[in-house]
Amino acid sequence: VIASATCEARVELQPRSPLTLPGGAPDGVLRARAGVLERLLHVDGRPVIVRAAHGAGRAAVLLGAWGPSRGLCTVALARMRFALGIDDDVSEFHRRFREDPLIGRAVRSAPGLRPARRPDPFEALAWAICEQLIEFTRAAAIERRIVARLGRGAPGTQLRDLPTAATLAGAAPALLESFDLAGRRAIALRRAAREVASGRVNLASDDHER
């Protein structure tokens, strides 16, 4: 638990459809250890650690957060609840596609699978740019380098979060290219980060796509 954590929040949730928690993430930000998922998030710039695990019988999901205040922990829990798809009802999807000739076998074999999501909109944007038009394994390696070199940590934990938009906006293109990010992608990432960091684009707004 991070050194600045003075508050703890826990919640037990019943997914709307069968859910299998992922086994960590290739970018190294979400980690799995002994059946427990763990990652560092930043809420309003403050570090919060969130953990998730299956409850007894694997029907329920247990979420816990440790951070500077209950309010920040509550926000972090909500973000991970969204990212893990705990409230998604995929029963209609399974009913319609379990016998589909193309994807039916995959649907039947992994009923607890959820679409991959990110708990932070800028994280989703930054990684979408990194993952364009290249192999996913190569993109994940680039993301791990970005997190290792520019990401945020917190005292008391080895977990790391993505860098802020301001940090990426100020990163030299040559540095980003040294992570194996293509030149055009490096420029696009800096430009997108600059728009977010300056406030000209508010990803939390309902009309951010305009």
At which residue positions do the language-model features occur?
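HhH-family (HhH-GPD) DNA N-glycosylase catalytic core used in base-excision repair
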Residues: V1-R210
